[in-house]
């Protein structure tokens, strides 16, 4: 019986000529004349046992592929050009991709030009980016590859500080490519992380590129109001899904989001004031009643900072209150702050550089009803007066942007909405062009390069250019609350001495 001789790494395999001539694969068609010669056909880059497995497949149309031998069989199948075995191997590898091997499979797919495996391994890296940073192969990704991964809209990061830690870990292994840090969007990075990056001698350029990482964009919590029961839903820009979280039977409440929990504060139930605070976890949808506030009140102002929920002012029956207090997330004790200089309800409060600013609202007693324009700032454990707003406003929405405060006013006694900018360092107010008029509730939050306003439609206001964009949407009887990530960077005064400890803590929190 005539045979064709193959030599692999010095080992000889004799193959029946009939198997070679019956093969439909191009590689064997090209060597069918070699059986007349005595010399062996040398095969380079192929494993001996993998070639045996391919011969078994040619004989019996069966092959034993496992996670342990799949790579060597796949390499042999690619070189020998046996498409059915290539497909079987690729399916096996894709089925077994996980966060511990996805970078190795990613590199393998590039080396041999396997598009399906490339796409599958890239998807696994994108979905498990924080976990794969522990892989020794992570630092060997090229600058362009990591840029592509971190620029993908579905990359699984939920805070730009997490992106920063991923980049810092990669830069540690690739110190000649520090300019990759410029894929960060500074507006989404906390001051603490910015300081740490600066102490490392790195400079982040102001980004002019659009934000592609959906996970760092603001999630939205929506409360659709009715006369009795309001429905709470949560929208994730990353998944593009709306999820019903639960319901509340309160009116005249305030709400805010802290550590992925929505807090419903005060208000009225069946026309009775309440001092209870409810909290719903937006991931598990579980409700919990937290410690009561110091008094019964509705129409309070709230803001969050450094893991704490601040509740300021409000209406105690028919009298405005100046009580200010805060609750640290996960604790059960309210801490009182000094009272406001002027009691008020329905005002706005916002943090700028760890100072609280409170503005507008209504001061009322049994005899008085005064719409306010005054502004107070809580700094160094006391309230101080600041320059008043240009006009008196009972409904005020405020947001911090680039170290200053932007205020949009509602309509009650006023004839139209106003837009103001408060320059914090100069203690100065200026009036800006207001694009629309809307009677009813609004939502305002800072979203990177613009301020989002939801009223009768969705508006984007760009402070740097003083321009507006308009998007139609149905917003009747809906309130919107900003959603913050639970992965908050440890807040501290980062110095050269404390920098290693800070980065170590962030790595443990974000990347493990």
Swiss-Prot record:
InterPro entries: BACK (IPR011705), BTB/POZ_dom (IPR000210), Kelch-typ_b-propeller (IPR015915), Kelch_1 (IPR006652), SKP1/BTB/POZ_sf (IPR011333). It comes from the Viruses. Belongs to the poxviruses Kelch family. Keywords: Kelch repeat, Repeat. Gene3D superfamilies: 1.25.40.420, Kelch-type beta propeller, Potassium Channel Kv1.1, Chain A. Kelch repeats lie at residues 216-261, 262-307, 309-354, 356-403, 405-449, 452-498. Pfam families: BACK, BTB, Kelch_1. Residues 102-176 form the BACK domain. Residues 2-67 form the BTB domain. This is Kelch repeat protein C2. Disulfide bonds: none annotated.
């Amino acid at each position: 019986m005539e045979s064709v001789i193959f030599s692999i790494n010095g080992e000889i395999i004799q193959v029946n000529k009939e198997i070679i001539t019956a093969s439909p694969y191009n590689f064997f068609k090209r060597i069918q004349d070699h059986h007349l010669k005595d010399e062996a056909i040398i095969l380079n880059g192929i494993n001996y046992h993998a070639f045996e497995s391919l011969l078994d497949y040619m004989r019996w149309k069966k092959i034993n592929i496992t996670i342990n031998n799949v790579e060597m069989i796949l390499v042999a199948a690619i070189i020998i050009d046996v498409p059915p075995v290539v497909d079987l191997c690729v399916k096996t590898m894709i089925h077994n991709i996980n966060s511990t091997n996805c970078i190795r499979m990613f590199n393998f797919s590039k080396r041999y030009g396997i598009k399906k495996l490339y796409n599958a391994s890239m998807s696994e890296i994108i979905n498990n980016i924080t976990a794969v940073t522990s892989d020794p192969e992570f630092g060997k990704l090229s600058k362009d590859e990591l840029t592509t991964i971190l620029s993908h809209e579905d990359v699984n990061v939920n805070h730009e500080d997490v992106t920063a830690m991923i980049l810092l870990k990669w830069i540690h292994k690739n110190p000649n490519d520090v300019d990759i840090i410029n894929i960060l969007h500074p507006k989404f990075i906390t001051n603490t992380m910015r300081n740490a990056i600066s102490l490392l001698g790195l400079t982040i350029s102001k980004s002019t590129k659009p934000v592609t990482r959906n996970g760092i964009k603001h999630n939205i919590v929506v409360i659709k109001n009715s006369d009795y029961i309001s429905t709470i839903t949560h929208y994730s820009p990353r998944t593009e899904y709306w999820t019903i979280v639960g319901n509340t039977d309160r009116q005249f409440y305030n709400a805010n989001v802290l550590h992925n929990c929505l807090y419903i504060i005060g208000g009225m139930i069946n026309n009775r004031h309440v001092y209870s605070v409810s909290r719903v976890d937006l991931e598990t949808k579980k409700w919990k009643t937290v410690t009561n506030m110091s008094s019964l009140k509705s129409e309070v102002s709230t803001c969050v900072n450094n893991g704490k929920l601040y509740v300021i002012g409000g209406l105690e029956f028919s009298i405005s209150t100046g009580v200010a207090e805060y609750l640290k997330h996960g604790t059960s004790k309210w801490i009182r702050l000094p009272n406001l200089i002027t009691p008020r309800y329905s005002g706005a409060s916002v943090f700028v550089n760890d100072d609280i600013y409170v503005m507008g609202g209504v001061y009322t007693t049994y005899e008085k009803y005064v719409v306010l324009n005054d502004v107070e700032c809580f700094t160094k454990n006391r309230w101080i007066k600041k320059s008043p707003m240009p006009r008196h406003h009972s409904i005020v929405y405020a947001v911090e942007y680039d170290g200053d405060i932007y205020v949009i006013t509602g309509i009650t006694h006023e004839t139209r909405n106003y837009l103001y900018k408060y320059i914090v360092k100069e203690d100065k107010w200026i009036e800006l062009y207001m694009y629309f008029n809307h009677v009813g509730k609004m939502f305002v939050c800072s979203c990177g390069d613009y301020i989002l306003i939801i009223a009768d439609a969705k508006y984007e206001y760009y402070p740097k250019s003083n321009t507006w964009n308009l998007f139609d949407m149905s917003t009747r009887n809906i309130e919107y609350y900003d959603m913050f990530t639970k992965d908050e960077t440890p807040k501290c005064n980062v110095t050269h001495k404390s920098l290693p400890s800070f980065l170590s803590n962030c790595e443990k929190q974000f990347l493990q």
